[in-house]
């Protein structure tokens, strides 16, 4: 069981900022920006390469919800970045697909 499943089951506390039937968003405990939220499906999708065509609707709704989450957290106007890390070289540390929403400061390009 991943840490995200434990958070979804309320076995581990988290600052949840948004929740729907099949995904939720919470503040990252090790933020990399003033606003750093993880948007996570409640069921495990083991990384982006573990997604299947049937996941498209869920993943699309997670992306669409990011604009509401950004608005709620006060970064919709100034701007925010969405990131999906996939694999060790990208920094993926939990084998459960999730989207990082980062904002509250200027983001450099290229990242990393």
State what each model feature region is.
Residues 1-112:
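HIT superfamily nucleotide-processing domains
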């Amino acid at each position: 069981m991943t840490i995200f499943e434990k958070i979804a089951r309320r076995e581990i506390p988290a600052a949840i900022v948004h929740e729907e039937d099949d995904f939720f968003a919470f503040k990252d405990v090790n933020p990399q920006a003033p606003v750093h939220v993880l948007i996570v499906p409640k069921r495990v999708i083991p990384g982006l390469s573990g997604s299947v065509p049937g996941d498209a609707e869920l993943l699309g709704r997670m992306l669409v919800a990011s604009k509401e989450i950004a608005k709620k957290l006060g970064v919709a106007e100034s701007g925010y970045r969405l990131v999906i890390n996939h694999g060790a070289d990208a920094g993926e540390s939990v084998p459960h697909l999730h989207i990082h929403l980062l904002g509250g400061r200027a983001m450099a390009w290229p990242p990393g």
